[in-house]
Amino acid sequence: MNWSNTPSFLEKQRQRLERYQFQIKVSEQGRVVSVGDGIIWIKGLPGAAIDEILISEDECCIAMVFHLTEELVGAVMLVQTKKLKAGTPIFPLKRVLSIPVGDKLLGRVIDPLGHPLDGGEIPPHEEQGLLDRLSPPILHRDFVNRPLYTGNKMLDNLIPIGKGQRELLIGDNGLGKSALALDIVMNQKDKKVYCVYVLIGQKRSTVSSTIQLLKEANALDYTTVVVAQATALPGLLYLAPFAGCAIAEHWMKKGLDALVIYDDLSAHANSYRELSLLLRRPPGREAFPADIFYLHSRLLERSTCLSPALGGGSMTALPIIETKEGEMATYIPTNLISITDGQIFFDESLFSSGFLPAIDITKSVSRVGGKAQHPQIKKESGRMKLDYLQFLDLELFTRFGAKLDAKMQKQIQKGRVLREILKQERFSPLPIEFQLAWLIAYNEGFFDELNLEDIPKMLKKIEEEIKQSTLSLGSPREQWKKAIKEWLMA
């Protein structure tokens, strides 16, 4: 063996020393000044950044940087602990919050940090999604051009929603906003739409009943539930919608369709106001901080329809907001109305009169959903919303004893028939084929001679026949007309 070209041991060490570069590892350490109400004030940490994660020495405390001053760092607690006190060392992790994402979260109930609340295993961490990230730029977006079927007669026909749209559900407490949202989730079964239901500031009983309803409808198979209860730390209430958005965003970027429901953003706005006041930020209108509009806009702008070049995925957002005595002109509702692509308004007087869902057509609008509506549905619904609004005006005159001619009386009768048709029980989503069937039946006058009490029976008959029929949205109208006539005559 030739050893002449083999470097000696000393030569190897010399080469290693030449390559060696001395690096000083610098780590920051701060100390707790005060702690209380879910807020930590920390001295030190000159390199701290907004949204950065902080931990204590024994890792019993996890917090997030939320406010910076010249002397102190304000952080929000994300884990409840009694071990934290003044003088406790705090260390930055030099990274921002992320959450596990992916198909393995389907059927799970988690908190905004990704911890399981259903007694199951900890979700795998192979795929992570940032809680807060920039929304897709304009060039990465596409027009809303595909319908999201809700299973609701009023929405699918008069206030249609498209995939990638942001539609606000607004109204007083207890009028059925959450029930409608659950209806929409239940209707996505077998439609390849992944759902995320975010419960923000809800009571434990409400959380339990919501999860139970999803289980009974077999909707948990394609749904992830993110929960921040009313008793949770304000920091978790603040993070909950961002966690749900990150989970849904993962499916959108994979070219799939996702639906995320924020129930509700009133509690989210209140938690943000609480944190801001505790951190001594200057209050603005209704004591909310000045950037509350930016907070909700950067959350909702992440919901969109991506261009085909990026997979064509979509994320539809249905934020829920609560009003007081039907007042829409308050700060947070007006903010969200201006951010979203339309709103569905729930009216207390309609609810009291037994008209369910208590959706006020006069104040509800879908600005982009009409472009995504199926041509057959769009053609049949046509002027229906306008005709219904005219009927409401005419009916108002009859209450004052005004005399109407035969044409107007016929229009009022037809409007009352339509109002009876649009009534729908909770948690009973209907297939889109049924929607087309009743539209054709209504336009052909098949309901005109019926008593209002008989209309639900006829609708039930159509619903039963639809389940056994081979007709689809693409079938010729004459086939639909002939089949419906036979069903109603039988």
From Swiss-Prot:
A Gene Ontology CC term for this entry? proton-transporting ATP synthase complex
* A GO MF term: ADP binding
Membrane-topology descriptor = Peripheral membrane protein
Q: What is the uppermost EC class here?
A: translocase
Q: Give the location in the cell.
A: Cell inner membrane
Family from the record: Belongs to the ATPase alpha/beta chains family.
The molecule here is called ATP synthase subunit alpha 1
The gene it comes from is atpA1
